[in-house]
From Swiss-Prot:
Keywords, ordered alphabetically: ATP-binding, Cytoplasm, Nucleotide-binding, Nucleus
GO MF terms held by the record: ATP binding; ATP hydrolysis activity
Subunit note: Interacts with CCR4 and SSN2.
PANTHER family: SKFA PEPTIDE EXPORT ATP-BINDING PROTEIN SKFE
Source organism per UniProt: Saccharomyces cerevisiae (strain ATCC 204508 / S288c) (Baker's yeast)
Pfam families on file: ABC_tran
Keyword Cytoplasm assigned: yes
Domain ABC transporter: 7-249
Entry GO CC: CCR4-NOT complex; cytoplasm; nucleus
Protein name: CCR4-associated factor 16
Record's keyword annotation contains Methyltransferase: no
Length: 289
């Protein structure tokens, strides 16, 4: 059976044992298939914790999480066969792919090993067409040796490894920070194409907003473990070419219809900056800027 939503979360609260306050508080989400969701928030807002819960890396004890209709912590979610695929096809997909900060520090990236050898060890020959596409998109030379690469080059190889096997739900946590502008733009365009051509969805937490103006379907703002803003990109976000009384600086909030107006730029950076300033509650003038 094909689930109605890629991700469904009900009344999710999570607290680390060593913490007195929960990191995630009463989260409710319904993320449809074929969508791209952007998660915005200051450090410590709960973004990484939420993504780890969605991936099954933390056990949910208070609330309910369904990814592709199943609990991500359940072993059943690894071998699910949906109505729109055969058993053979299902082996070519994994329900959830999580690429986060600890994944970026895997020890193998510093070994003296060839890139092609590394890719072949995780199924490059089986997913050759997809692998070759990722190599082109990320501008990877398969003759590279991993221990000789820059941080940015290593990150590109890691992303090719992480994205090689197709996924139903992709969870990205700050993994594009080392990419140059071109590699990042190509990667985002590839992920957009993926969500438009097959049944899958992406949730992306980041502090880098340039080039994202036309990318997401939903924008979620997290503060103190809660989702405090949830914007439908088509309905709630407007880019204005005229900076007038309606737009105070670069962003204006219309309280009557929950709409956000942003001065005409190809970036969600002004909105993210305004949200984080409000979260911080310290006016710029008080810190001398």
């Amino acid at each position: 059976m094909v689930s109605q939503f890629a991700i469904e979360v009900r009344n999710l609260t999570y607290k680390f044992k060593e913490s007195s306050d929960p990191s995630v508080v009463d989260i409710n989400l319904q993320i449809p298939w074929n969508t791209r969701s952007l998660v915005v928030g200051a450090n410590g807002a709960g973004k990484s914790t939420l993504l780890k819960l969605l991936s099954g890396k933390h056990l949910c004890l208070d609330g309910k999480i369904l990814v592709n209709g199943l609990d991500p912590f359940s072993p059943l979610s690894m071998n699910q066969v949906d109505d729109d695929e055969s058993v053979e096809d299902s082996t070519n997909y994994q329900t959830t792919t999580y690429l986060g900060t600890e994944w970026c520090h895997m020890s193998i990236i510093n070994r003296d090993i060839g890139v092609l050898e590394l890719l072949k060890s995780i199924g490059f020959d089986h997913f050759r067409e997809r692998g070759e596409r990722l190599v082109r998109i990320l501008d990877i030379d398969v003759r590279w040796r991993m221990h000789r690469l820059s941080d940015g080059q290593k990150r590109r190889v890691q992303l090719a490894m992480g994205l090689l096997k197709p996924w139903r739900v992709l969870l990205l946590d700050e993994v594009t920070v080392d990419l140059d502008v071109i590699a990042r733009a190509r990667l985002l365009e590839f992920l957009k194409w993926e969500t438009e051509t097959r049944r899958c969805s992406v949730v992306y937490a980041t502090h880098i907003f340039d080039g994202l103006a036309k990318w997401p379907n939903q924008v979620y703002h997290m503060k103190s473990g809660k989702i405090v803003d949830n914007l439908d990109y088509q309905k709630d976000v407007e880019f204005s070419e005229v900076v007038n009384a309606k737009v105070n600086g670069q962003v204006a909030f219309e309280n009557d219809n929950n709409k956000v107006v942003i001065s005409k730029v190809n970036s969600l950076h002004p909105l993210a900056l305004e949200w984080l300033k409000r979260d911080n509650q310290i006016p710029d003038k008080e810190i001398g800027i």
